[in-house]
Amino acid sequence: MGKNEARRSALAPDHGTVVCDPLRRLNRMHATPEESIRIVAAQKKKAQDEYGAASITILEGLEAVRKRPGMYIGSTGERGLHHLIWEVVDNAVDEAMAGYATTVNVVLLEDGGVEVADDGRGIPVATHASGIPTVDVVMTQLHAGGKFDSDAYAISGGLHGVGVSVVNALSTRLEVEIKRDGYEWSQVYEKSEPLGLKQGAPTKKTGSTVRFWADPAVFETTEYDFETVARRLQEMAFLNKGLTINLTDERVTQDEVVDEVVSDVAEAPKSASERAAESTAPHKVKSRTFHYPGGLVDFVKHINRTKNAIHSSIVDFSGKGTGHEVEIAMQWNAGYSESVHTFANTINTHEGGTHEEGFRSALTSVVNKYAKDRKLLKDKDPNLTGDDIREGLAAVISVKVSEPQFEGQTKTKLGNTEVKSFVQKVCNEQLTHWFEANPTDSKVVVNKAVSSAQARIAARKARELVRRKSATDIGGLPGKLADCRSTDPRKSELYVVEGDSAGGSAKSGRDSMFQAILPLRGKIINVEKARIDRVLKNTEVQAIITALGTGIHDEFDIGKLRYHKIVLMADADVDGQHISTLLLTLLFRFMRPLIENGHVFLAQPPLYKLKWQRSDPEFAYSDRERDGLLEAGLKAGKKINKEDGIQRYKGLGEMDAKELWETTMDPSVRVLRQVTLDDAAAADELFSILMGEDVDARRSFITRNAKDVRFLDV
């Protein structure tokens, strides 16, 4: 019996020791105000006749979640799958935020499950007012939990309060082990239904352990990505000063582990039955520990570690109000892009919100006043803009709000209006004090902003030049653009193609109704190493900005986007990958909403062409696919051409128009990889490493990831 089977056997219900059997109270449990009502659409031909009481379906309890999972976790793809982990971890971190937990352990189990344990107070097990164990209320009813009681949690995260009950709803099995009230307790949920709470051995410890196995019938994939989990947990550790978070991946075999090896996994939570079933011999797994005594200061150091800071000290301050807290850490670097990351109750607010608005307003006001008072700006000079001041700024803003109001189902923007004035007041006071107390560093910061303003003025002139130049072209579009006939952006695609040769083949092979082609003839500038005025003088950048129509930075307007699919098509070699990375850096730094809204894709041209005797050729997009096609063809009795049976494409230019259409551009067969942005801080770091000035950091990154095949695909 394997260790997971042994654990499940140990947790199987023994009705002789059941403290409370909630199955008897299901009717009472389901009759809650949180019942979701959904209209079941009848068939069109019967809709008018049969639409009545029978057409209204009440989705009771967690059935509503399984019926519409996207409403609760955003999607059923990789992002939604990982959100299950975030929900359980958020509950554990809530205990740390409340001052009751110091350690959170997360384990990716070898059988595909996930285990999250904390040393907090433990989920309550006493009988709830509804007549069932409180743990069952938490696990089986939406909008139930301690986060709704300000006495239990002053501040908490979680996805609109639905939390762990949604995890239970979307799992085939969920197990809970609790240490509380002097005993160990356990409960198992099979397809969301509780099997019976069991009381175990006496203990003086406290804490909760939750294990779950995502339902493959709900999710497109049930395979978790270690790096995605690691980034999120590291972020949580930064935001909770002093908290220790351990991540262990039991799916990794000893042979796969390179430099993240431990021989003793005692920190990972194990039940007594697991330990008894396991061998006592040490084994190797992949693990990481995140612990940051400096909190946000360490976060800013992490962001700036591949960049050159222009002042040594990190600005760090905090403030408290009624129902509000804010902590901010910040430092300027010599780069040209801002890296401001905002959080509310440890939730990453990718779209910002009122906390960021308050910070920006105060920062702009304080810097301008200081610059004028110290004569670093003349009275007749125009004020520095927010963009000028935030050039090269790395900052983390973390607020804690007792009654947060988030815009959007997945909490990406904070909406509390009172938070803006609160943050603005704290920042005005603290930033004024820092600038007054650090005149040398302050002068460096102001001078950088002044230099940025000068570049902004030059960039405006460059923009006007681009606009005037565009106006001389037909329709105001770049001359090299082969536009499509469709005028509907939702149906239109823009292929940005490397090289004239491939551009010519793409123009000939495309469907001109909806596919536009923009060939890049010269090398695009590396925007990571250039200020905006230099960037806008680059001919290829001008062509891309004009073709897309959205503008850049503060002038960006996604409503003016001319193509809803932007496909980057480059050679499948190192040079092609470099071109793609340059283009992605441009879009990330100057037109980030294009990525955030899912408009950017990478084309996947084939690597190989298999030429069969008396049969149509086949195309392979990887070495594995090439070997598979070759093996299958030979088994089927096909014969490969002797001289040029397997052709490896060195570039797009080697394919004629027909081949390019059939392999890379035909919507019915092509493979496109959508570029997504789940973690802005991680993306910012990656672009800085790959395209920045730090050669050692880039070499280290390449060395670490050389064996990871994912990075061969850009």
From Swiss-Prot:
> Which co-factors does it depend on?
Mg(2+); Mn(2+); Ca(2+)
rRNA processing as UniProt keyword: no
Q: Where in the cell is it found?
A: Cytoplasm
| Residue positions binding Mg(2+) 2 | D571, D573
Cited SMART domains: HATPase_c, TOP2c
Keywords in alphabetical order: ATP-binding, Cytoplasm, DNA-binding, Isomerase, Magnesium, Metal-binding, Nucleotide-binding, Topoisomerase
Gene Ontology cellular-component terms for this entry are: chromosome; cytoplasm
Task: Please state every residue range assigned to the domain named Toprim.
Answer: 492-606
Q: Report which reactions are catalysed by this protein.
A: ATP-dependent breakage, passage and rejoining of double-stranded DNA
Further remark:
Few gyrases are as efficient as E.coli at forming negative supercoils. Not all organisms have 2 type II topoisomerases; in organisms with a single type II topoisomerase this enzyme also has to decatenate newly replicated chromosomes.
Tell me how this protein assembles. Heterotetramer, composed of two GyrA and two GyrB chains. In the heterotetramer, GyrA contains the active site tyrosine that forms a transient covalent intermediate with DNA, while GyrB binds cofactors and catalyzes ATP hydrolysis.
- Family indicated by similarity: Belongs to the type II topoisomerase GyrB family.
Q: What is this protein called?
A: DNA gyrase subunit B
